[in-house]
């Protein structure tokens, strides 16, 4: 979905890239299914719009060959990702996706991550049932704002609001490398977002509540509704 048009002149990938750029992130690695990589590259090009075309800032694109809807990946997925992380020299890594549209101040998430001193922090938002799909993770969060467990959304639940993971994570890079090396050794390694969900629950990650506008793009209808939302000035200026 990264290269889908949005709001007239934008693409879905513009929003996570802008959040990263606004937080001062200057090295980005994006990994995409092979059939989609050309349209993503054609849109990003030099990366100049996000400050990614200088001597000290850059981006890389990786590819994988398994189906987009599959939760597992081939060996090449983690070979590329781990190579990038080892060479990045970064103390912290942000993981963010293109199917959840937000305008988030990642500096606030960095600050809380550093304050709590845990290896992983996750961003979530309270949402009603109608805005969530069965591919989204619902977090159980305790009174100290730490994750205790997660599960896929169950449409049969009678709850009014759910703690939906945005699948935005801030993670200590050395710790992440060790965990991903373990994942890469499995016969059927899972995609990064699924690994991070499990790690957040296992490690009792700090849960940062995002309270701004969010569009969860999980179907044609939700994609259409997100575009229609932009006709409302409050939602438009919340995202832009």
Where are these regions (language model features)?
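Residues at the starts of beta-strands that form the adenosine-phosphate
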Residues: 26-28, 92, 119, 204
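Short, conserved catalytic or adaptor-binding loops enriched in Gly and charged residues
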Residues: 50-63, 140-142, 197-200
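Well-ordered alpha-helical segments embedded in enzymatic catalytic cores
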Residues: 12-16, 76-81, 195
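Conserved beta-loop-beta/alpha segment of the NTase-like Rossmann-fold superfamily
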Residues: 57-138
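Catalytic-core segments of class I nucleotidyltransferases/pyrophosphorylases
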Residues: 94, 110, 142-239
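N-terminal glycine-rich phosphate-binding loop and ensuing alpha1 helix
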Residues: 1-49, 55
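Alpha-helix N-cap/loop-to-helix initiation residues
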Residues: 36-37, 102-103, 216
